[in-house]
């Protein structure tokens, strides 16, 4: 197969992916005793498209899958998509709104039908993009968290947990999105710092002329206050504890209580306690057994009658609220109440105050802590009949503590344990239509029945008219079951037996609690074993300035645009469409034009993957730099061109395939073979320990520097001057080292390595399989490491570097050839044929003593070197003097800039660092120029 003159990724990527899939390489065998390797894809939202985080995550997962496949393991990478309850419902509702229709106009069943229609049309975007990234997943195992198989597992888990007393319905404080009309998880809440105010309000002490002044950022919740708290160690207010206060605007009285939650140094030292509208206050109220007074409706407007509850969820009546505020939004109620407080002389002060405002990540509306009826999983209770005597949380804590589940890097264990040891019961219900409908029904009296089907439930309530609960389950509930539901549970399948636990989960740190911990809980509880052995936590991909990539910032990069390239107008359109804050569009356009004046060039999948791998150090966030992607695109070109050179020099010739023919290896051949063994061992260790950054660096250094820049160049000398046995050994080494390097690189750059391997492998006598994907992973043979050859190569490199430095000092252009004289051991004569080529020499000789000439001398190991070139001393002195003068001037200017008062403190850190590096380079250059001038003198 003849290689094209240049590497064009688009010409090979789709072709090879289709071939791999058609050949069945992505599928495991269910009839084998080989060790198994399984990995679960964190299921992306069905609404989503591939972003840089996905590309990063999937590069690591595919790299591991390809690595273990080549090692001979029975590999399975399970793909899937999450139904993404809230996100999907919003998308479809927006489409309906454009037609002037709401979901309520359609009704539940028709609306859900519309969602399924949308999913069938649009839901495959991310899977087609995964193919572009080269993901070798078993597409036959692809699941959707709402498909029949997954839904059966979800229902089964819910029913079993309910029967074990671990699922219950209760009234609790939850994050409530009033615009969506549903509870949301903490992950769907973004707290943003905003300019607000702190109001100081008087609360008169009953039976006294004293008042206490309470500082609050939310005066509209005052109607639901049940107490005012002080710190028990605050001497100023200890005498007030137990006293009653008049609650402004209500006619009620509330007590002063002491609680450690209060920071005596913040505000006035008094804190209003409103447990029905604040999570911290809820905990304070629970400790003091106060009432819960709910003053808001589900649309975040004020009620006419407050609802009063106990912490056990029991209704305790109602309280009339001022009619003037009934039906007002929280913002309007705040204005009205502040005016009334001011008129009553109870508003003391208003101060500017920066505060964190929780907003829904999809709606932007303020999230209200609200008391609502929800379904919960009991996290710290032992299930009925559980022989382990442990809660689902404790089982998950033990799994990590015992080492059955290992975090990489291990510092994330502390984060995991901190969350687990402070866990609250999990709110699993959502007031949506799209999702797994809760398998619970109610009779006319409101009694709940839970079962797998209506028929099963009806048998428990004969003669009763049953109404199904309209809520759906939190998306994270079904995601938590993926390690076993995706493999056929509750049925006992061969896949469950073979692939649980999986070897590793690859994910970001932001979902350790929401997903990782819950998978460990559910799998240990239902299967009695862990879902995975390792959890590899990687950082977040940020933009080049370290900012989080987000649509609102306009700095999102589509990985496919890096693969295929994109013109500037299309890129601007992409970045400014659908902004939550359209007013930011001009700013985004300006930034995009500055960063990508010509758009984004096409880098190809392999360069993108290698870039991602190079960033995959343990747990660190990634500032994505396009220059690195460009560098690795050049690396692909280097690998391609080196292979073309090798093929042109070996094709049709004897490459040492006939083992009976003599082979005469030079020290250069032995050196590259030695380095290859060390590379095989080091890359294997790097991948075994998830150090993709090290693996990519090792491969890059070996291929670019050692193989291409040194060995291939030296092989030219051997092919030109060697005898038949030497040439045969060189050709054999060229192709065999390249073939192994391609296999080592394949997990990171699958497409280019496959294309090149198909050409190289037959000549290396290594084409034992039809694809590099299933070729054997290289195993180092340390007996092939030749220490003597490596030592000689080190000396030779010193010699060549010294020659190059001499050429630089003497200002010799690339076309100028000069004779080299070496004063040193006779063994240096072996190096000279190679040095002639690499040092651009007209001749080279080992002599007893260097000639007496006006030429600089260099030291390399045991040798002294001289390039004998007639130099015009006067002209060279003038040139060096001029260069020294310019360098001194540049050093002086840069030093003055860095010493300028305030520059280092006020200028951007990147700019200061660049200036310091430039100064160091200039200082070094100046020292070298002065040394050259001194030698001439």
Swiss-Prot record:
A motif ('HIGH' region) lies at residues 44-54. ATP binds at residue 551. GO terms for biological process: valyl-tRNA aminoacylation. This is Valine--tRNA ligase. Residues 874-937 form a coiled coil. The gene is valS. It holds the Pfam family Anticodon_1. One of its GO terms (cellular component) is cytosol. It is an enzyme of class 6 (ligase). Catalyzes the attachment of valine to tRNA(Val). As ValRS can inadvertently accommodate and process structurally similar amino acids such as threonine, to avoid such errors, it has a 'posttransfer' editing activity that hydrolyzes mischarged Thr-tRNA(Val) in a tRNA-dependent manner. It comes from Laribacter hongkongensis (strain HLHK9). It comes from the Bacteria. PANTHER family: VALINE--TRNA LIGASE, CHLOROPLASTIC_MITOCHONDRIAL 2, VALYL-TRNA SYNTHETASES.
